[in-house]
Amino acid sequence: MPEKVRAELKTIIRNRALEVGFDVVRFTTADPDPLNAKALNEFISQGRQGDMAWLDNKNGRRGNPLALMPEAKTIIMLGANYGPNIDPIEIQNNKGKISIYARGRDYHDVLKKKMRKLARWLAETQKCGIKIFVDTAPIMEKPLAQKAGIGWQGKHTNLVSREFGSWLFLAEIFTTLNLTPDLAETDHCGSCELCMKACPTDALAEPYRID
């Protein structure tokens, strides 16, 4: 596929994704990511995953998108903003707080509906193979999002977007389309440690490491 055609197709896909309700659309390759897979294995070997048994990576699937779809060439990374209109830290200081993401409808259901609409259109118009994922498969979403240019993993280990901060739900479409990847994002945290100071459980003993 000529580069001009690939660029035009990316624009068409991006516009369609925005139409169905996503706020960020980026593209990256489906290549394995051994560096981040190694970091995850070290995290698990130190027992820092707690009772999150689903993070297990013994079969090596995390960090290797091709284990989920061997024929995939491109991953379309999608982000949906769920940021509130008010600062949740400054309200109801004398009451227990429920995480913003849990105050509305289950985001898995919301995003899957949007993704199915987008994926159906993509499969019908481009005659390509696709698979969709919304935080339910062994995928290292944050490293993929950084590789696609959506944002970077901050010192709190969450994804940070220049436009949306850390208020993004992530989802992916794996496809056999061979599209030009976007540029990866770089770390812009610098000397800032606001997230570490704000952590209510002091789980961030050092930058980029959550206990």
PLM feature spans:
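Auxiliary alpha/beta "docking" domains used to position bulky ligands
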Residues: 1-188
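Iron-sulfur cluster-binding cysteine motifs and their immediate structural context
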Residues: 19-22, 32, 194-211
